[in-house]
């Protein structure tokens, strides 16, 4: 099928594949998992992590803080066009930052996956600013 006849998620996968085929050692990706279903989001992010481990420099934007927690070493937070924070994803993406960015109270759950610590956010309610 032609590019114009495939779904939005399939188009996004094609765009990611095109970036990889170019063999650039630095990849800048604007929301590479946009329009992808849950499984394909994971596949794309896992491939990005694999590329980073193989020596690629990856810069990507995401509105999914869990992607940054699970797949990124470092995070830079921008809110309303202003630089807010930078550092390791585990340090920067915390409960207070989620409240500040999204107006949602969260708890961070930690587990071990493949002998590595993995952290995920669980929303528990909206913050006082929304009440």
What label would you give each PLM region?
Residues 42-54:
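Helical segment within the ABC ATPase nucleotide-binding domain
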Residues 75-88:
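H-loop (His-switch) and adjacent beta-strand-loop-beta switch element
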Residues 27-30:
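Catalytic Walker B motif of ABC-type/P-loop ATPase nucleotide-binding domains
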Residues 68-70:
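A short, surface-exposed alpha-helical micro-motif characterized by mixed small hydrophobic
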Residues 38-40:
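Helix N-cap at the start of a conserved alpha-helix in ABC-type nucleotide-binding domains
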